[in-house]
Amino acid sequence: MTKKRAVITGMGSISCIGNDLKEISNSLRQGISGISKNDEYDDLGFRSKVSGSILIDLKDLIDRKLFRFMGEAAAYSYLSALDALRDAKLPESIFETDRIGVIAGSGGASSRSQVDAADIL
């Protein structure tokens, strides 16, 4: 069995405590949790009224034609992947090869996306 090597060259993240690695690191060092009261949850009748909301305007950061086919979780993953490319100092053209991969994680779809999907049903 041939061993294959993997190299982590860059990281990117968007979260309720920051929209890039520097902001997230600073928030962690300062003990900022990012959890706050969410009035929208109250309006929707949720029992829990708190959330770790991400404060970023996706429509300002992603081309409209691309964004219209993305859910919020996919959009956050996309922006995080672009940050990872910048962190690695790699050009976006690197995606033209089949020797690159992105490992992405998400806490799940947004509550708003779930409510919208239920309304469609």
Region spans (language model):
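Conserved "HGTGT" condensation-loop signature of ketosynthase/thiolase-family condensing enzymes
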Residues: 1-121
